[in-house]
Amino acid sequence: MENFYKVGTIVNTQGLQGEVRILPSTDFANERFSKGAVLALFDDKDNYIQDLKVKSGRLQKNFYVVKFEGFYHINDVEKYKGYVVKIAQENQEELNDGEFYYHEIIGSDVYDNDILIGQISEILQPGANDVWVVKRKGKRDLLLPYIPPVVLKVDVAQHRVDVDIMEGLDD
């Protein structure tokens, strides 16, 4: 089976017309949940269920409300709560230099002055720039803004990120 990457989790239904609420976990949510997009549905044990074609999608608060083709009633989609939607690797677009997909960054080792400080576990999108969450042993998570003075170098092939922890970031 080809490689798939998680783009969201179905967290609930929306209304009676077969729409679902999806909590996005992707860097291109508008594209992933727009009309015509094809997503793969996986159950809570990561078993492939079927491909889904987006009929409509809209942002509502922190969720995307999505209607898939062929699902017309709440009873058609209620069983998919907790399931995950993914995109096939072949459907990902090429990125420009200096751009990365979340799955390329999450799991990378983070170094400050060549000292391993942790691993990126999550990427948040609170506003102007992304924030990378670094899991550390014996310490609380470190929140790193993805800005040039902090993130010095990203080596996707080596799963390595070099950073400069500025004063005040690790208090």
UniProtKB/Swiss-Prot annotation:
The subcellular localization recorded is:
Cytoplasm
Instruction: List GO terms (cellular component aspect).
Output: cytoplasm; ribosome
> Which biological processes are named by the entry's GO terms?
ribosomal small subunit biogenesis; rRNA processing
Q: What is its main location?
A: cytoplasm
Q: Where does the record locate the signal sequence feature?
A: none
What Pfam families does the entry give? PRC, RimM
Q: GO molecular function terms here?
A: ribosome binding
Highest taxon of source: Bacteria
Q: Where is the PRC barrel domain?
A: 97-169
Could you describe the subunit structure of this protein? Binds ribosomal protein uS19.
The domain comment in this protein's record states: The PRC barrel domain binds ribosomal protein uS19.
Q: What does this protein do?
A: An accessory protein needed during the final step in the assembly of 30S ribosomal subunit, possibly for assembly of the head region. Essential for efficient processing of 16S rRNA. May be needed both before and after RbfA during the maturation of 16S rRNA. It has affinity for free ribosomal 30S subunits but not for 70S ribosomes.
* Family stated for the protein in its record: Belongs to the RimM family.
Q: Which HAMAP family match?
A: Ribosome_mat_RimM
Q: What is this protein called?
A: Ribosome maturation factor RimM
What is the taxonomic lineage of the source species? Bacteria, Bacillati, Bacillota, Bacilli, Lactobacillales
